[in-house]
Amino acid sequence: MTQPSLSVLYSDHLRTLTARADQALQRGGFDHLVIPSGTTHYQLFDDRDYPFAVNPQFKAWVPLTRMPHSWLVYTPGKRPTVIFYQPFDYWHVVPDAPSGWWVEHCDIHIIRTPEAALPLLPARTERCAILGEAASALGACVPNNPAAVLDFLDYQRAFKTPYELAVMRLAQQLAVRGHRAAEAAFRAGQSEFGIHMAYCSAVGQDANELPYGNIIALNEHGAVLHYTELGRQAPQPLRSFLIDAGASAHGYASDITRTYAADAGSEFQALIDAVDAAQLRMGNAVRAGMDYKQLHVDAHLSLMGILHDFGIITVSPEAALATGVSAAFFPHGLGHLIGLQVHDVAGFAASDRGGRIERPDGHPYLRLTRVLEPGMVVTIEPGVYFIDMLLDEVKKNGHAASVNWDRVAQFAPYGGIRIEDEVVCTDGDPENLTRPVFAAP
């Protein structure tokens, strides 16, 4: 079956965005939506700039991610206007003129200086909802970020359009290409730095283009949840490899994690296999009407069941959860919304009018508390780790007898396990965006 082109999908996507913007502006009492792309920031006491990070609200409308000093203006009933910054500059590469599937749907004005945008922006700035950072202010056009507008737009961003799902699939394909190269580099005995370079080369993106810093962790480093140090020497012996790495496509992110054992016949490989099977079951529970908080709690029980089966804990999964022992082995949340941002916005939103759904007690790092609905894309990333400081807390809290410390000592040199896919909630069965790409030849 032929898939619609990105041009067709983008046209429908834009209709969805304008409808959302119409309602958001009405709620906030504004006439115009104005979104700056962002500005260049410089390092303290230096003339070196930081890598540019585009305003996510801007790239929701147009797939431009490296365009500081540009603007998006939308007035209900009119086509969106893109003010495109293309400076006269012989120090840097100047952006090419706008092109691609999106240009026919927008009115485009090219400017040569940031200040040239001012006469192209709405004159009555008090009638504008201006979404951006304070540094993007230009004359009287100062970001005000009205809550009524942001609450509505952020909440609705959880529901992905077919265009968004299409480009997120592209981000999956790029990341899986990198994951395959990274595993091959691991099997070849490369260092963390070498594996990272193999990943970037395969994806075709450098550290500034990737949606987040690669986590490339060998052996015990897998116990550091956000390990980003990239050792230059491979440890000996080489036991395990945890990789958490994504890719960017037209402003959208992918976020994938895999764990590998150097010895496919080891008990650690068996533990990986058990977590992998549990992760698939968790992904299959991503269904409309399911409370993500419950998925997170169920994940704790499932993982503790595995640890009990492997003789790592001595108490029931329910007891491990109730006493906090489970949090020592699985200290982060099950996952989060993903899209324009890796940790996409409004994960705690009670409604499109604001409010907050709190995390369950004892789970301070869960990033999503909403009830799942069709169109949401979430990560499912259970993990089991052997983290000294957290296991020491188990002892201090009087629960040492709940853990088989000899078994912990056997697994600790491997660091930990995390497996992460992206899953779409639909009206029926969930769609795993990640597994089919790995399964493809």
UniProtKB/Swiss-Prot annotation:
It is an enzyme of class 3 (hydrolase). Splits dipeptides with a prolyl residue in the C-terminal position. This is Xaa-Pro dipeptidase. GO terms for biological process: proteolysis. InterPro entries: Creatin/AminoP/Spt16_N, Creatinase/aminopeptidase-like, PepQ_N, Pept_M24, Peptidase_M24B_aminopep-P_CS, X-Pro_dipept-like, X_Pro_dipept. It holds the Pfam family Peptidase_M24. The gene is pepQ. NCBIfam families: PRK13607.1. It comes from Xanthomonas campestris pv. campestris (strain ATCC 33913 / DSM 3586 / NCPPB 528 / LMG 568 / P 25). Mn(2+) 2 binds at D244, D255, E420. Belongs to the peptidase M24B family. Bacterial-type prolidase subfamily. Its cofactor is Mn(2+). It comes from the Bacteria. Mn(2+) 1 binds at D255, H336, E381, E420. Its EC number is 3.4.13.9. It catalyses: Xaa-L-Pro dipeptide + H2O = an L-alpha-amino acid + L-proline. Binds 2 manganese ions per subunit. Keywords: Dipeptidase, Hydrolase, Manganese, Metal-binding, Metalloprotease, Protease.
